Curated annotation (Swiss-Prot):
Its EC number is 3.6.1.15, 3.6.1.6. It catalyses: a ribonucleoside 5'-triphosphate + H2O = a ribonucleoside 5'-diphosphate + phosphate + H(+); a ribonucleoside 5'-diphosphate + H2O = a ribonucleoside 5'-phosphate + phosphate + H(+). Mg(2+) 2 binds at D105, D107, D120, E123. Belongs to the Ntdp family. Its cofactor is Mg(2+). Has nucleoside phosphatase activity towards nucleoside triphosphates and nucleoside diphosphates. Mg(2+) 1 binds at N87, D103, D107. This is Nucleoside triphosphate/diphosphate phosphatase. It comes from the Bacteria. The active site is at R23. It holds the Pfam family DUF402. Keywords: Hydrolase, Magnesium, Metal-binding. Disulfide bonds: none annotated.
Length: 177
């Protein structure tokens, strides 16, 4: 499949391990694609939950997906600074319909003051049994939590202030064309 290019809009779909659709984001603007990564932005993007509820994102958010890492990163740009929501998830695939990944419940939230929290551990444990997550997936996810925490600690990639400034500036340039 041809990679989307800068300024294109794509749909993002997250699934659960059992194959059920979890959440959809419509009209994510692509800022950059490479063979292994996609950087985009959601700004007042329509989100549809699996139960049909809909809502619109409140602030601009730089989104980062990679084909090697078992997480994706949402950097929410707010008046009081940047906060992050990181999903432990399968590497993404891109087809003619959408960018797709499997959401594995565990999340890491990074507040604008730098505080980190691992979220939804109970939900992960319930779904691990209910959906029969294989032990190798459990291991991979736990190892990727460590990678993610290291990225946060060392301000790597999306956790770098310069990264956010560069991609937010590029978004504003594309938006105002």
């Amino acid at each position: 499949m041809k990679l989307p290019k800068e300024g294109d809009f794509i749909t993002i779909q997250s699934y659960k391990h059992d194959g059920s659709l979890h959440r959809t984001w419509r009209d994510t603007m692509v800022l950059k694609t490479t063979e292994n990564a996609l950087i985009g932005v959601n700004d007042h993007t329509l989100v549809t939950e699996n139960d049909g509820r809909r809502w619109v994102t409140r602030e601009p958010a730089i989104v980062y997906f990679h084909k090697k890492y078992w997480f994706n990163i949402i950097a929410m740009i707010r008046d009081n600074g940047v906060s992050y929501y990181c999903n432990l998830a399968s590497p993404y695939v891109l087809d003619g319909e959408a960018l797709k990944y499997i959401d594995y419940d565990l999340d890491v939230k990074v507040f604008s003051d730098g505080e980190k929290r691992l979220l939804d551990v109970d939900e992960y444990e319930v779904h691990k049994v209910k959906m029969a997550y294989p032990s190798d997936i459990d291991y991979i996810l736990k190892e990727n939590v460590k990678v993610l925490v290291d990225w946060i600690k060392h301000k790597k990639g999306p956790f770098s202030e310069a990264y956010i400034k560069i991609w937010y500036k590029r978004y504003l340039e594309l938006k105002n064309r």
